[in-house]
């Protein structure tokens, strides 16, 4: 319930906003997917914010047992990656091209829920690799975006 602002520290240790996440959004998945410390800070935009905390164990179990939730996570991460690619302004256009032409990225762009469900049943490790790829790519792009804003 409510909205939160997501920010990450820039190289000068000043928090830089990546934007406001609307009600119903999820966050913290990058840390859970990669078993790394969180890279972002979340700040409530009002006194009326309610969040649900999910342990790493429960998160992993949920992703393995609920393909529809995993598919939604995959699409959401892909959309966030795509939105960040649209927001950054690289001097070298090959930077954006590298992500948009990556076979993993293009596969996800075309994947429907049935295809995803079939892949998830046959090869759950591949699904984890897709999620981790998107997560690490998004973190890199977030850092690139913040470094551009700091200049």
Feature roles, as predicted:
Residues 98, 103-151:
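Phosphate-/nucleic-acid-contacting segments
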Residues 17-78, 82-83, 89-93, 100-121:
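Cyclic-nucleotide recognition modules
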Residues 9-11, 89, 146:
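Short, flexible helix-adjacent loops and helix caps
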Residues 1-12, 23-24, 106:
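Glycine- and acidic-residue-biased ligand/ion/polar-headgroup-sensing regions
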């Amino acid at each position: 319930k409510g909205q939160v602002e997501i920010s990450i520290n820039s190289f000068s240790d000043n928090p830089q906003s990546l934007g406001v996440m609307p009600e119903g959004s999820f966050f913290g998945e990058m840390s859970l997917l990669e078993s790394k410390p969180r890279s972002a800070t979340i700040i409530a935009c009002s006194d009326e914010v309610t969040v649900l905390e999910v342990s790493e164990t429960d998160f992993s179990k949920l992703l393995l047992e609920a393909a529809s939730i995993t598919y939604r996570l995959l699409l959401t991460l892909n959309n966030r990656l795509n939105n960040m690619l649209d927001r950054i302004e690289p001097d070298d256009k090959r930077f954006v091209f590298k992500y948009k032409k990556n076979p993993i990225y293009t596969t996800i762009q075309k994947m429907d829920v049935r295809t995803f469900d079939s892949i998830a049943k046959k090869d759950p490790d591949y699904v984890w690799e897709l999620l981790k790829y998107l997560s690490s790519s998004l973190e890199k792009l977030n850092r690139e975006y913040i470094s551009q804003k700091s200049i």
